[in-house]
């Protein structure tokens, strides 16, 4: 096993520990004082041979964490460390000037982690409780990330899932971008070449045979739907179905004029005004993006900005992704 497992491995600390029988330590941030590189609830995995997955700082403390991980594997007892402000480790400084409390949990119960992995794969909101003294794990249906008495709770909301409808470079580039970062996604297109390019980028693809939102396509409150069509007559039937579901983001590429025409058509189809108000367009934080790459980054930034601010259950994605 390499000393530092790449993020591209596709595993997060929970899944990695659950599926690897080697002795491991879970390191999780239980408290933050001042600025911090990672949020409360962020975690990394450290194995007995020094291998690790994830990071809790910008490289300041990970090597030291590996040393302490070896110690807790030897004792079998959890341990909480303080780094930065107020830390006894005066030779290790955090450039941000803040402080971190980190719990080291030796040999976490793999059975609990396996069940947690299954729930997350099924896109279920869930949480896990960790007794900071005994290391006992409790699987919860939900919970707020933070320390409650002697139990530290981490909530896990599903990752944002992207449903990308469209044809051409914009749809291909955006799908490849979200795929490269590790977000679940599905590219739906009437165009064979678009689907081939998307599949070559590792995206899941589906042939869109007619302008409609597929009846068997399931969405949830962590779903983002984005349309990249130059042929705008495909949009209204798809948007009609998209706006009828719980997706937190629905947007379509196009100018302000195209947006106005789109809204009139949807209104004529009977879409309620409250649902029309949910439709984003022109999409993206950068106005008048002129190339597929800039547009893709712009749209992704807008979606993730909304994902971290909308008041739906589980918007705080402080779990171990």
Residue spans for each PLM region:
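Short amphipathic alpha-helix with an adjacent loop that forms part of the alpha/beta core around
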Residues: 211-221
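Adenosine-phosphate binding glycine-rich loop
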Residues: 248, 253-321
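Beta-loop-alpha module in the N-terminal Rossmann-like domain of NAD(P)-dependent dehydrogenases
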Residues: 232-236
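ADP-ribose/adenylate-binding Rossmann-like module
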Residues: 188, 224-225, 229-230, 240-265
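Short, well-ordered beta-strand core segments
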Residues: 205-206, 225, 250, 286
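Segments forming oxygen-rich coordination pockets for charged ligands
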Residues: 1-206, 222-223, 258, 264, ...
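A generic structural signal for alpha->beta connector loops
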Residues: 182, 202-203, 246-247, 275-276
């Amino acid at each position: 096993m390499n000393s530092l497992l790449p993020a591209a491995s596709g595993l997060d600390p929970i899944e990695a520990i659950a599926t690897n029988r080697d002795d491991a330590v879970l390191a999780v941030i239980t408290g933050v004082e001042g600025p911090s590189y990672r949020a409360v609830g962020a975690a990394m995995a450290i194995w007995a041979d020094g291998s690790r997955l994830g990071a809790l700082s910008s490289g300041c403390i990970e090597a030291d964490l590996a040393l302490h991980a070896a110690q807790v594997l030897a004792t079998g007892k959890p341990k909480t460390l303080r780094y930065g402000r107020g830390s006894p480790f005066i030779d290790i400084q955090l450039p941000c000037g803040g402080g971190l409390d980190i719990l080291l949990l030796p040999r976490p119960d793999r059975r609990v982690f396996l069940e947690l992995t299954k729930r997350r794969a099924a896109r279920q909101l869930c949480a896990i409780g960790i007794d900071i003294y005994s290391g006992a794990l409790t699987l919860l249906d939900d919970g707020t990330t933070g320390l409650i008495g002697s139990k530290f709770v981490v909530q896990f909301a599903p990752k944002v899932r992207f449903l990308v409808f469209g044809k051409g470079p914009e749809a291909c580039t955006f799908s490849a971008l979200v795929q490269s970062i590790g977000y679940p996604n599905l590219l739906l297109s009437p165009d064979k070449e678009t689907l081939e390019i998307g599949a070559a980028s590792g995206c899941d693809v589906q042939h869109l045979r007619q302008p409609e939102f597929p009846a068997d396509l399931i969405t949830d409150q962590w779903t983002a739907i984005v349309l990249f069509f130059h042929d705008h007559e495909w949009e209204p039937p798809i948007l009609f179905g998209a706006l009828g579901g719980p997706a937190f983001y629905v947007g379509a590429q196009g100018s302000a004029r195209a947006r106005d025409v789109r809204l009139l058509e949807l209104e004529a189809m009977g879409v309620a005004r409250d649902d029309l108000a949910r439709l984003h367009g022109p999409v993206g934080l950068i106005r008048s993006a002129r190339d597929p790459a800039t547009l893709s980054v712009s749209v992704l930034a807008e979606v993730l900005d909304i994902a971290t601010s909308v008041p739906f259950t589980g918007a705080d994605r402080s779990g171990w992704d």
